[in-house]
Design a protein with these regions (language model features):
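Catalytic-loop of the protein kinase fold
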Residues: 127-146
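ATP-binding glycine-rich loop module of kinase domains
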Residues: 27-50
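Conserved activation segment of eukaryotic-like protein kinases, specifically the C-terminal portion
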Residues: 171-182
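Conserved HxN/HPN-centered segment at the entrance to the catalytic loop
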Residues: 64-74
C-alpha cells in the first residue's frame, strides 16, 4: 500500500485551477482534508528551486500554531499516469469564514474580535520564524473557522501564495490573488 492509498475519499469539497480538495478518512476512520495538487499545472514560482519541493507543502511541514491548519502528511503519487503532490490536514468541524458570513449575513463584533486576534497571532508567528513567512492573500476564503466550541477559532489555510521573506527570488505566484487581500 502506498502512502496516499491509506486515505479513502468521502467527497470532493472544492476544485481549484491546479488542485482538488477532498474530505477523506484513513484506515483507522480518522477524518482529514486532502489537497491533491497536479504538478504539471503548477507555476515554477510555486517550487523551491533549491529543493524542487512545492513551497506550500515545504513551509507547512516546518510550522505549528493553533491558528494555522496543521499538515499531518504529505507526499507524491502517480494517478492515471499523472504526477501529483498531496497534503493532508486535520479535519476541522466548521466552515470557511466566507461561508459563515454569507450564512449569517455578517459577523458579530464578539466573534470578529476572536477571529482577528487569532489571525494576528498566526501572522506574528509566521513573521517571527527564522526565515519569516509572508502569507499573501489573506481572504475570507482562506480562513477556516473551527466551530466545535462556543467561540469560532480561525485557522489560516492554503499557503499556495506564501513565501519566505529571505528567499533569493522574491517574486511570488500571483495568479488568483485579489489586490484587496495582498499582504
Amino acid at each position: 500500500i502506498t502512502a496516499i492509498e491509506q486515505y479513502k475519499v468521502v467527497f470532493l469539497l472544492r476544485k481549484g485551477s491546479y488542485y482538488d480538495v477532498y474530505r477523506v478518512v484513513d484506515n483507522k476512520d480518522g477524518k482529514y482534508f486532502l489537497k491533491l495538487i497536479n504538478l504539471a499545472k503548477l507555476d515554477e514560482l510555486q517550487f523551491n528551486p533549491a529543493t524542487d519541493q512545492i513551497c506550500e507543502i515545504e513551509m507547512k511541514r516546518e510550522i505549528s500554531h493553533p491558528n494555522i491548519m496543521r499538515q499531518i502528511d504529505s507526499g507524491e503519487a502517480i494517478i492515471d499516469g499523472q504526477r501529483y503532490a498531496y497534503s493532508v490536514s486535520d479535519f476541522i468541524p466548521g466552515e470557511l469564514l466566507s461561508e459563515n458570513i454569507s450564512r449569517k449575513g455578517g459577523c458579530s463584533i464578539y466573534d470578529m474580535k476572536h477571529i482577528v486576534t487569532g489571525l494576528l497571532n498566526a501572522l506574528k508567528y509566521l513573521h517571527s520564524q527564522k526565515e519569516p513567512i509572508i502569507f499573501n492573500g489573506i481572504s475570507p476564503n482562506r480562513i477556516m473557522l473551527n466551530l466545535s466550541s462556543g467561540t469560532p477559532i480561525p485557522l489560516l489555510m492554503d499557503f499556495d501564495h506564501a513565501r519566505k521573506l529571505n528567499k533569493v527570488n522574491l517574486k511570488c505566484y500571483m495568479k488568483g490573488l485579489s489586490p484587496f487581500y495582498l499582504a
